From Swiss-Prot:
Its EC number is 2.4.1.-. This is Glucosyltransferase 3. One of its GO terms (biological process) is protein glycosylation. Transmembrane segments: none annotated. HAMAP family: Gtf3. Binds protein substrate via an exposed loop in the N-terminus. Dimerizes via the C-terminus; dimerization is required for tetramer formation. Binds protein substrate via an exposed loop in the N-terminus. InterPro entries: Gtf3, Ig-like_dom_sf. Required for polymorphic O-glycosylation of the serine-rich repeat protein PsrP. Catalyzes the second step in glycosylation of the serine-rich repeat protein in this bacteria. Transfers glucose from UDP-glucose to the terminal GlcNAc moiety of 3-O-(N-acetyl-alpha-D-glucosaminyl)-L-seryl-[protein] which results from the first glycosylation step of PsrP (using the short substrate SRR1-GlcNAc). Has weak hydrolytic activity against UDP-glucose and even weaker activity on UDP-galactose. Does not complement deletion of the gtf3 gene from S.parasanguinis strain FW213. Encoded in RD10, a pathogenicity island with an atypical GC content that is associated with invasive pneumococcal disease. Pathogenicity islands account for greater than half the genomic diversity observed between isolates. The main function of this island seems to be correct synthesis and export of pneumococcal serine-rich repeat protein PsrP. It comes from Streptococcus pneumoniae serotype 4 (strain ATCC BAA-334 / TIGR4). It is an enzyme of class 2 (transferase).
Length: 336
């Protein structure tokens, strides 16, 4: 019996999708998982026969009765994913479905796909969901899989020697401003530094600097010099589900914490309570409140918080959340 894990290729190097799947693969390889590479492509170019042959090639290293962690979705469409699931089940492969995103819940226009995704989730022997809220929502939609694990936090593996964060009353935001209209109008006194090539500041914005996209190594080093990491909602964007942000977990949270700095998140974020309870950051319901949190912080409080985060960031750096998930998932395969 061998262990396998799918890993996506073919998207832009700065894609969160690619970065997340590649990070899981890197961590899983330390536990003996073998990579099953899947290339992102336009499935419309395949006839049913060609897709079938493509999947046979992808599955060539998998034997009857093996264990596969399927990082979901592949972004090749549910037809591709569903056929792969069916072929794996024909080979009596034990499937651990590691959900990164639930496509029918991301955008209102995709909700019609819910039955197709539930079909795959319900075929899974073990399901890994992002949060307790997502677990509850999927069960309301018709999820019947009994063995369900909750991820809770993304890891962010790296081999860098980071700085010790200095106390700075400034905010960082790593992400496209196009998806966060509120931040394009930033007008608080606290400086906001944005690392993105997408989106522009409005004419009324102040204390806002857009510094361009940075590679992961550059970003972590810059963040680790000190300040606060900001995570914000996308509720103003047409077509995006208002609830999705409350169900999924944020990669940005892990990036900031891995760099060793406190985070400020919306209270609606699925991990908000955990962040506050663990002393890793703060909740805020408005950008004015975000500014007030930073403005009222003092050196002693900041150092106490970053000392706490230093211990937690080691877990993310070394991939312990993912390692525990994968070990627990395999354990649950063997027990009733």
């Amino acid at each position: 019996m061998k262990l396998h894990l799918t890993n996506l290729y073919g998207m832009a190097g700065d894609s969160t999708v690619i970065l997340a799947q590649n990070a899981v693969q890197k961590i899983a390889s330390q536990l003996g998982f073998r990579e099953v590479g899947i290339y992102f492509y336009n499935i419309a170019s395949d006839s049913p026969s060609e897709m079938n042959k493509r999947l046979d090639g992808i599955m060539a290293s998998i034997s009857i009765g093996d264990i596969l962690v399927f990082q979901s979705p592949t972004w090749n469409g549910f037809e591709f994913d569903r056929l792969l699931f069916d072929k794996l089940k024909d080979m009596q492969v034990k499937i651990i479905c590691f959900i990164h995103d639930v496509v029918p819940l991301m955008f209102d226009s995709n909700y019609y796909l819910m039955k197709d995704y539930l079909y795959m989730y319900n075929l899974s022997d073990v399901l890994i969901v992002p949060s307790e809220r997502m677990k509850t929502r999927l069960m309301e939609e018709g999820l019947t899989t009994k063995k369900i694990l909750v991820q809770g936090m993304w890891d962010h593996p790296h081999d860098l020697s980071l700085y010790t964060p200095a106390f700075k009353k400034e905010l960082f935001f790593a992400g496209s401003l196009e998806r966060f209209p509120d931040l394009q109008n930033w007008s608080q006194d606290t400086p906001l530094r944005v690392f993105s090539n997408k989106g522009e500041a409005s004419s009324s914005a102040r204390s806002l600097s857009i510094e361009g996209w940075k590679k992961d190594e550059e970003l972590l080093l810059e963040l680790s010099k000190g300040g606060f990491g900001l995570v914000w909602g996308t509720h103003q964007n047409e077509g995006e589900s208002n609830q999705y942000y409350t169900l999924n977990i944020s990669h940005k949270v892990s990036t900031y914490l891995t760099a060793g700095i406190p985070v400020i998140v919306p209270s609606s974020l699925s991990t908000a309570k955990f962040i506050v309870d663990q002393g890793l950051g703060f909740m805020a319901d408005s950008l004015e409140e975000v500014h007030e949190i930073v403005d009222k912080m003092n050196l002693q409080e900041y150092q106490e918080m970053t000392n706490r985060i230093k211990t937690f960031s080691y877990l993310l750096k070394e991939g312990y959340f993912t390692k525990k998930l994968l070990v627990d998932a395999i354990y649950h395969l063997g027990i009733d």
